[in-house]
Amino acid sequence: RGHTASGDEITPAPRTLTSSTVPKVHRIQNNRLPRYLPPTDIEAILEWVRRESSYGVRDYAMFLLMARLGLRVPEVMAIEIDDIDWRAGELLVRGKGKRRDRLPLPEDVGAAISAYLRDARPSTVTRVLFVRSYAPYLGFKDSRIVSKILARACAALKIEMPARYLGSHVLRHSLATRMVRSGVALHEVGDVLRHKSRATTMIYAKLDIANLRSVAQPWPAGEAKQ
């Protein structure tokens, strides 16, 4: 042990740096650009689903929820009839980790859901909104049905997916990309997508250099030197 000139003891510095002495730095795991489709392709897919899908009224409402609100497939399939507040124009969404959010219901999405309830949803005891087309009329067990419908739409329209295994998540990425390129602030994009961390939303900043400059934060150490 060492001593000061006055005889007081001092604590010796550790000889080596360990994981307990070095602060952790948060790293963004996914550095790739988000995969997306242009708005014209998204609208073409929605129109194909509405007209050509075997159960177009139902499928169109499901796809609109993903394309307009950025919902994930499990979130769409978890929606119950009572989650829709028609007077307030809001939708309760059950997200990851038991998260609950109330989102505004766009007019076209509300109209599509209303048409499904009125014209296409079979009579059933379940309160799940979207049900299978055969008895017993219950909710979906396999979320891959949405990706299969999307694959058929892309094949019919000769639209090439930006990644082979991206599936229906491309609708969510495409919504975020469209918002960023329209000048929407990144924190607002994160609010729409209901990201827990701002770091998750930052992958979309790489799409537009001008928008990236507007959200860049100065490094605190750099400010101190000025």
Where is each model-derived feature located?
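Conserved catalytic core of the tyrosine transesterase superfamily
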Residues: R1-Q226
